[in-house]
Curated annotation (Swiss-Prot):
Belongs to the RNase HII family. One of its GO terms (cellular component) is ribonuclease H2 complex. Keywords: Cytoplasm, Endonuclease, Hydrolase, Manganese, Metal-binding, Nuclease. This is Ribonuclease HII. GO terms for molecular function: manganese ion binding; RNA binding; RNA-DNA hybrid ribonuclease activity. Manganese or magnesium. Binds 1 divalent metal ion per monomer in the absence of substrate. May bind a second metal ion after substrate binding. Gene3D superfamilies: Ribonuclease H-like superfamily/Ribonuclease H (3.30.420.10). The lineage of its organism: Bacteria, Pseudomonadati, Pseudomonadota, Betaproteobacteria, Burkholderiales. Its cofactor is Mn(2+); Mg(2+). It is an enzyme of class 3 (hydrolase). It comes from Polynucleobacter necessarius subsp. necessarius (strain STIR1). Endonuclease that specifically degrades the RNA of RNA-DNA hybrids. InterPro entries: RNase_HII (IPR022898), RNase_HII/HIII (IPR001352), RNase_HII/HIII_dom (IPR024567), RNaseH-like_sf (IPR012337), RNaseH_sf (IPR036397).
Amino acid sequence: MSIIWVCGVDEAGRGPLVGAVVAGAVVLDPNNPIEGLKDSKKLTAARREYLYEQIMEKAKAWGVGEASPTEIDEINILQATMLAMRRAIEDLATRLGAWPDKALIDGNRCPELPIAAEAIIKGDTKEPAISAASIVAKVTRDRQMMSLHERHPEYGFAQHMGYPTEAHFAALKQYGACDQHRRCFSPVRKALESVAS
């Protein structure tokens, strides 16, 4: 009997004004379970980091994909999210040595894939593989934001991870946008217009 590999897929970073949208894809190993998987948004940063390391160690395979701020500006955030998810599954397939048999996607739509896929609304609370993918995506993106904070501390990315907050709006107004800001997002566009005028 052949084993059926099902991968969970989720994204992090659709809402922020800056940085890539990142997707994770994970095939869990039923013989090597990971305790405590749940939606990454409901976990502390320390717990996410711990579970991320557990996933790296115990999952059958995992993958990460992203779409850059430039790609987000060119094709819009929804299409960029689908692109990041497809890239994450491709990365996972490379590590697994084969395409998974099926992808379970968090949300209400699936990217175009060469395998069966099912969209599951609130899938990160229903499917452990999607929860694991959520953790991989969130930790990867948070690490990118911490790195970006080192390059641009004036924006306070370490505090808000690029999300639209009063502090982020104030920094945009004072400093304009950095090279990683998403120009197609209204608050960034307005900041650029006010700096230009």
